[in-house]
Amino acid sequence: MRGHLRRRLWTVPLCASAVALTAAVGPITSSSADTITTTACNNRTNDTVAKLVECIRTDDLWNQMKAQQAIADAHPDAGGHASRNSGEPGYKAAVDLAVKLFKASGYHVTVQTYTFPYFAFFGLPGGSEVSPTPTTFTLGTDLNAFNSVGTVTAEVQPVGGIILPPTPTPSSSSGCSPADFAGFTPGNIALIQRGTCNFGEKAKNAVAAGAAGVLIFNEGQPGRTGLAGGGGMIDSAGNSVVPNIPVGFVPFAEGEHLNNAANAGQHPQVKLDFKAEADPNRDDFNVIADSPFGDPNHTVVVDAHYDAIFGAGMLDNASGSVTLMDIAQKLAKVRTKNRLRYILFGGEELGLLGSDYYTHNLSPTELAQIGYDLDADVTATQNYTIGVLDPAAKNLFGGPIPVFPANVYEPSKFARDEAVKYYDSIGLNHEFFSPQGTDAFWFNMVGVPASGILTGQDCCKTQEQVNLFGGQTGNFEGNLGTTDGGCVDQPFRWCDNLSNNDPNVLTFETKAFAKMVFKMAFDTTILTRTPQQAVAARTAAEQQKAARMAGASHAPMS
């Protein structure tokens, strides 16, 4: 699940792998033995919800999870880590497997290709202060790396606009103007204070001035002293910036120290070593599988994102993808009233790229045909919560609640309430969450009602959630009992592997999602729109997107 700008403000772990722990929460609803065989399920038509749910088998789900892990293991990234990341061989191999599965089940399959700016580090970025105080920077404590490539050892030269001591409120515009680089010596490392403009704008100006590297340091006010930054950068126009020189971020104390050393004539030197691969036009893929049954003018999209980030991505989101594919197999023979369209999206971890591309490249008629979206995003969390998607619910990332077209709110309750009824029937509580950070977001934005499921990731499970769902406070997954952030989406941990999932949670979550899918496959109240209404909603979404990008150029990435 994507959060913020895919949580590109990095924190880096003290260890490189998760500790395998027994799940803190015992499932309430799944029996230890399945009551029907895979063969029996595949040979019959599961044309009632009871038949479908009966055929959701732990063994089937877990075997598919093992297959996804095997793909990741067989296709490591350039650093040797198991990978299903977009733009890498592991993801393409996973796409090929999904295509084979859908075709074998009788679906009409299309692989939709789009391009995106690919970036990946080889191993761990590093750096050190060579002089006047030799110090090796610890990644995640002393240094964060922006998406940039290069190795340099050079003198550090402060640029214009640095304000020390800092003013009570942020005011530094260091590096925001080419004029700040007047007199800069090409080949030096530019020392720039955080503030006013985007990190990417500062980096662009440094590159234009001939810098061989960049160190941006925190500005120094309360709350702006420690480590920040890292990950992707954008310029003032909202364009991605990936310099061919290393660009790092250091805490205020290190920046102030280097600035003072330079002003004292000590000629401080720093080494930065960021090995990476960048490709501005890497192919990525969405897998689209249409049922041969059902009314195409009343299409229900069932989606999950298929890509990973920083590794195998088994909880986020092989689990949701397996939930989707298992249901697709079990429903393949059913003559549904509405057409089911299963989509495995790429690029979700990088900013909902696949669903953005898909929803914005449908013809007006195609967009108007889609009456509903169901999203499965993280369905096997060990220390779980039970989340049900509702566009009116809270933003899990703490930001403002998105405003969607008015027509999505009431219909989104159709499937939402079906999930709630199921959880109530098996004695599980639930909580509602906004689609922000999921692929359902773009469907809601273009006026398509949506719901879905989520079981939690990263950190931190609250005491209130423990009271609802059991388990323990702290990480939802990964190193349980701690607050280190877990495995999902965490840079340089590579620990979101098969062991980071609970097969029993995966089973009862897939059953819940199966009931939602079956409900919408036969629902007669799905809202329909004219092509003109659909395009109007999409145009409004594009305008909101442009406004967000314009706003982002002023504060969030600086």
Give names to the regions the model predicted.
Residues 58-80, 86, 98-105, 193, ...:
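Catalytic-core environment of secreted peptidases
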Residues 86-88, 137-251, 429-430:
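Extracellular/luminal Protease-associated
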Residues 104, 240, 330-353, 376, ...:
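Short helix-loop-beta-strand segments that form the rim/entrance of peptidase-like active sites
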Residues 145-175, 237-315, 326-329, 337:
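Soluble metallo-hydrolase cores and metallopeptidase-like ectodomains found primarily
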